[in-house]
Design a protein with these regions (language model features):
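Terminal low-complexity tails and localization/encapsulation signals of metabolic enzymes
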Residues: 1-30, 63, 67, 117-142, ...
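N-terminal alpha-helical segment of soluble enzymes
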Residues: 22-87, 287
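Residue-level signal for inorganic ion chemistry
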Residues: 25, 61, 83, 163, ...
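Long amphipathic alpha-helix in the N-terminal Rossmann-like dinucleotide-binding domain
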Residues: 44, 66-77, 91-116
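Rossmann-like NAD(P) dinucleotide-binding subdomain of oxidoreductase/dehydrogenase enzymes
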Residues: 117-259
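ALDH superfamily catalytic-core signature
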Residues: 217, 225-371, 390-396
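Single conserved hydrophobic/aromatic residue that forms the stacking wall/gate
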Residues: 395-404
Length: 404
């Protein structure tokens, strides 16, 4: 069973929920379901650990961060396998990109924490204004389901490196790698209570965490609606919010089309398209639109959809049935709105092995001749669906591409 990680040890809960493999639909195991009680324990541990950790020399914190980064690097195969099992992300992406990036996050912020320089400003002959950076205190870190381990380290590394303590709340949809981070942190020498991890649902564990009066700052990655609710709930705390997106890609006629095609395919179809930075709207100058569209659709059709654990797979499974229904719902909307379907669509990918029969697989889907005011161009889909939009040079302007 996946438990909480509080004050340097595993902690159980009275309630549990079941975690599933999105590629097969099979149960992975039970997960502790935390609430206000577990959050209170975790915040208390973080609060108790804060004074000593905040006063630990930056050079010592940096050394511990580098050690944790090295331990993650040593465990890349194991962590990548867990991440793929949990999320449906292709193993070649978790093994070669996401977990190594998690290691790099700790190395990067190990350097940052020893170089936090303030500034001074002479006001007159008798007065000097200066800035001094100090740790905030207990931070609530809320990580999403799509790239859970990498995003968790993206939050944890700067938080801990700069002298804060943390309570990390993972998504209930992808909890497997969380306690691995807790165990590796202890192995690296990070004191108990500095990093605490609570599993559970957003409505219970997440809500209790952001409301807790001893939490001084909140870092949240997830949906825009949830981010707004957190700010309404938590009041005057410090925030770092990474919310929804509908990122544009611009293709001009003088672009290197080979490089542009590779980059555009990567931005939308890597990580199964389940990324807030997905390049889901591609604006293409009219003079090169036919050529770009033809080749882009052909390359999308050649992408390999299949078992996330197979190194050849390029697009894996959606995280849940509910999310699959959302993404396919937008494909239906695109068809109803009159966009031209050039690749993918609603048909299940062909030739999937029998053990993936219950998986949530969607073909890379390409809509061409999209009007930027269509819903598929205005609303975040969070899946392998892209809009190709022809546009004249005079309309390739910021007001056009950011009109969402």
């Amino acid at each position: 069973m996946i438990k909480h990680w509080i004050n340097g040890r595993e902690v159980e809960s009275r309630e549990v929920f079941t975690n599933y493999n999105p590629a097969t639909g099979e149960a992975i195991g039970e997960v502790a379901s935390g609430g206000a009680e577990e959050i209170a324990q975790a915040v208390a541990a973080a609060k108790d650990a804060f004074p000593k950790w905040a006063n630990t020399p930056a050079s010592v914190r940096a050394r511990l961060m580098r050690r944790l980064g090295a331990l993650i690097e040593e465990n890349v195969p194991h962590l990548a396998e867990l991440e793929t099992l949990d999320t449906g992300l292709p193993i070649h992406q978790t093994r070669n990109v996401l977990i190594p990036r998690a290691s790099h996050n700790f190395d990067f912020f190990a350097e940052v924490c020893t170089r936090m320089d303030g500034h001074s400003y002479p006001v007159d002959d008798q007065m000097l204004n200066y800035t001094l950076y100090q740790p905030v205190g207990v931070c609530a870190l809320v990580s999403p389901w799509n790239v859970p381990f990498m995003t968790a380290t993206w939050k944890t590394a700067p938080c801990l490196a700069l002298g804060n303590t943390a309570v990390l709340k993972m998504s209930e949809l992808s909890p497997l790698t969380a306690n691995e981070l807790g165990r590796l942190a202890v192995e690296a020498g990070i004191p108990a209570g500095v990093l605490n991890i609570v599993q559970g649902y957003g409505a219970t564990a997440g809500d209790a965490l952001v409301r807790h009066p001893d939490v001084r700052a909140i870092s949240f990655t997830g949906g825009t609606a949830t981010g707004k609710k957190i700010m309404q709930t938590a009041g005057l705390k410090k925030y770092s919010m990474e919310l929804g997106g509908k990122s544009p890609v611009l293709i001009f006629e003088d672009a290197d089309l080979e490089r542009a095609l590779d980059a555009a395919l990567f931005t939308i179809f890597s990580l199964n398209g389940e990324r807030c930075t997905a390049g889901s709207r591609i604006f293409i100058q009219e003079s090169v639109y036919p050529q770009f569209v033809k080749e882009f659709a052909a390359r999308a059709r050649r992408l390999i959809v299949g078992d996330p654990q197979d190194p050849k797979t390029q697009v894996g499974s959606m995280i849940t049935q509910a999310h699959y229904d959302k993404v396919t719902g937008y494909i239906r909307i695109g068809l109803e709105e009159g966009a031209t379907l050039l690749a993918g669509g609603l048909e299940r990918p062909a030739n999937l092995p029998a053990h993936l029969a219950r998986g949530q697989f969607i073909q890379p889907t390409v809509f061409a001749d999209v009007d930027n005011q269509m819903r598929i161009a205005q609303e975040e889909i969070f899946g392998p669906v892209v809009c190709l939009i022809p546009v004249s040079y005079t309309h390739l302007t910021l007001p056009t591409i950011y009109s969402v």
